[in-house]
Amino acid sequence: DAIKESAFTILGKPILFKYDMWTDDASSHEPEEVQCGFVPKDEKDADIQFEYDKDLGKTFLTVNAYLWNVYQEDLIRILQRDDGYKNVSVEMWLIEYDESTKEEKGYITVNQFVYNGITILGSSVTEACEGADMQVVKFSYDDYQKAQLQFEARLNNSINQESDEDSFLIQ
């Protein structure tokens, strides 16, 4: 229930990335992370959905987001090399939680939280929540141009004028 109640807080949040030159890959949660994209503020553009994974026994939030090509050459190259797939981890503030379950279950029960961002992880970094990943769904130039035109039309009508210039769609 907490994931569904907090889902709307992902809207407008940044996608974060730090390049690790030693592994030629993304890093992890680091103070030097930079914003490389965003989740749209508009619910329709973000297309928030919930998918239950039978094998993992978990419900995942899925959302559309955009990554910028400009200034992110390393990330683009990494995504092309890795077939557009990377594990991710979310950054969040816990609002309401129960620490009494930590000893018995090995984790605290989170009842309410707010998303702060999504971090792209390197291949050598294990995601905190197994199955948390991203997949580039639009990487071709033609698909990018179509998505860009649709997105720009919506974005130009928004109050906060984010730019999707030189970006592509991920989910």
What are these regions (language model features)?
Residues Q161-D164:
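Acidic, proline-/serine-/threonine-rich low-complexity intrinsically disordered repeat tracts
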Residues D47-S158:
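Residue microenvironments linked to proteolytic maturation
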Residues I170-Q171:
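C-terminal assembly interfaces
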